UniProtKB/Swiss-Prot annotation:
Organism: Bos taurus (Bovine)
Family statement: Belongs to the pyrroline-5-carboxylate reductase family.
NCBIfam families the UniProt entry points to: proC
Localisation per UniProt entry: Mitochondrion
UniProt-listed GO biological process terms: cellular response to oxidative stress; L-proline biosynthetic process; negative regulation of oxidative stress-induced neuron intrinsic apoptotic signaling pathway; proline biosynthetic process; regulation of mitochondrial membrane potential
Name of the molecule in the record: Pyrroline-5-carboxylate reductase 1, mitochondrial
Keywords in alphabetical order: Acetylation, Amino-acid biosynthesis, Mitochondrion, NADP, Oxidoreductase, Phosphoprotein, Proline biosynthesis, Stress response
Name of the gene this protein is made from: PYCR1
UniProt-annotated binding residues for L-proline: E164, A237, T238
Main location: mitochondrion
Amino acid sequence: MSVGFIGAGQLAFALAKGFTAAGVVAAHKIMASSPDMDLATVSALRKMGVNLTHHNKETVQHSDVLFLAVKPHIIPFILDEIAANIEARHIVVSCAAGVTISSIEKKLTAFQPAPKVIRCMTNTPVVVREGATVYATGTHAQVEDGRLLEQLMSSVGFCTEVEEDLIDAVTGLSGSGPAYAFTALDALADGGVKMGLPRRLAVRLGAQALLGAAKMLLDSEQHPGQLKDNVCSPGGATIHALHVLESGGFRSLLIKAVEASCTRTRELQSMADQEKVSPAAIKKTILDKVKLDSPPGTSLAPSGHSKLLPRSMAPAGKQD
């Protein structure tokens, strides 16, 4: 089985690293395409031994499972480019927030009468094999196609099948969830520093507290509220701290954050349906422009049946 990523950003890197660490896919069986070979994630993928190319169609050609790992509003343009190259063997997996199965199938059926499409929502902790993934299968995807994706994604964390109409809510909860956790951890560490702890120790203690709390919950059958109550002794420090959180609307803010992420996901779908995209994003999707912008000496060299960018040619990436 070969795996391809259209897009070589944070998600592609996280999944590729997770798959190779789990041993479910070898690095040389993975290909990623990107118009920008200066990305830090491209450099990291190269060091892992992943095949890289400027050409999305080449990634399609050399993949059995094809992940669309680009921004939602880019998806229609990518599909227009690769639709003619999709074959019956391909499993097309969209990781784009808000992009529906039907919108992808509509683009692909112009060339492939029964495209196998799966929509999934995952998160960046797949990089350490602690991701949270849900997926929904399309009209023509078979049971075994869903099982294959579940096998892949279960190797990098929790994975389960859901109805497609639940995926937007999942995006707001676990898709965006790591960002909520990192923000909370940053604030906890700031509190520790304010009270005299060294920054490094404060971050480590805060991270361990969140990790331990999550593991306690997953390993038990208790409600999180009960586990919270177990920490609070009468008149103690923790219940006083929780009073401050409740006074500040802590719970309400988290609920609103999930709702806001979910709502924005649906707005992104509307943008994708209308095929609206910024000029800067269009520039990134036009391969002819990429070729014109490529510096001398970065022509693609053959490797087997594919033309891959030599590892030595691309400079170390910078943060996107």
